[in-house]
A protein has these predicted regions:
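Non-transmembrane, heptad-repeat alpha-helical coiled-coil rod segments
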Residues: 177-210
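SMC-family hinge/dimerization module
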Residues: 124, 128-162, 169
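Conserved amphipathic alpha-helical "coupling/scaffold" segments
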Residues: 1-89, 93, 197-200, 204-218
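Coiled-coil heptad-register positions
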Residues: 43, 108, 112-115, 183, ...
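Surface positions of alpha-helical coiled-coils, especially the charged/polar e/g heptad sites
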Residues: 24, 82, 86-89, 93, ...
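Extended, charged coiled-coil "arm/hinge" scaffolds of SMC/Rad50-like chromosome-maintenance ATPases
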Residues: 64-77, 167-188
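Long, non-membrane, amphipathic alpha-helices that form coiled-coils
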Residues: 79, 86-100, 168, 175, ...
Length: 218
């Protein structure tokens, strides 16, 4: 039986209308998944005509929630990240983000190659303030135009967002804001789906804990 976390605080929070984050939902998902696995294990024992009456008394208390389990496993991965499969809208937004990032990198790669290399401290693309920038030598700050987002400790390098990519960076930022909003909506929806089942889920966690304890003593 896998070790599961204490989910009592999470169940308390959804009871008062709070939303769980991805990591917290992943913890609840582990309880539900383990419930399903324990149920299958006991079904296999029954098929084998093996009787463990003491354990069956605990198993009978489990409430399997297959549809809720499937919904959570589809939307939240084991690390608590909201997956692309969580909603068609999120998949579309993330595809837009990937395309925007690819476009920006291609634009910047074109800028830092060839003759422009002499204006740069290094021919790399990096990030400042969630914007793609390039490291430009202080004395050439006017070559690329655009926005200065940061400078090196020595002041010899400026991290500049060239004017050619400002619009692309703005589009990317817009997609990222949309992604965050959709993730918040999904987390709220999943948290709300748990509310009617919170007592069953909490009791399942207690039963699994007892079974794990008994297994440890065996």
């Amino acid at each position: 039986i896998p070790k599961i976390e204490n989910i009592r605080p999470q169940m308390k929070r959804i009871e008062i209308g709070a939303d769980l984050n991805g990591s917290e939902l992943a913890q609840v998902t582990r309880v539900l998944t383990t419930t399903s696995e324990v149920e299958r294990f006991f079904e296999d024992l029954a098929d084998s005509e093996i009787e463990l009456l003491r354990l069956y008394q605990w198993q009978k208390q489990l409430v399997n929630l297959p549809e809720l389990t499937r919904q959570l496993k589809t939307a939240i991965d084991e690390d608590g990240r909201v997956t692309d499969d969580a909603s068609p809208e999120l998949r579309t937004i993330r595809n837009n983000i990937r395309r925007s990032e690819q476009t920006i990198r291609e634009q910047l790669d074109g800028l830092i190659r060839g003759g422009n290399a002499k204006y740069l401290s290094d021919t790399i693309v990096t990030m400042r303030n969630d914007r793609y920038v390039i490291p430009v030598k202080q004395e050439y700050r006017g070559v690329f135009g655009g926005v200065v987002h940061d400078q090196s400790a020595s002041g010899q390098t400026l991290f500049i967002e060239p004017k050619q990519i400002v619009d692309s960076n703005n589009r990317l930022r817009s997609h990222q804001i949309a992604e965050r909003s959709e993730i918040e909506r999904i987390l709220a929806e999943l948290s709300a789906a748990l509310v009617p089942h919170r007592r069953d889920i909490l009791h399942n966690a207690t039963v699994i804990g007892h079974l794990d304890f008994i297994n440890g003593k065996a």
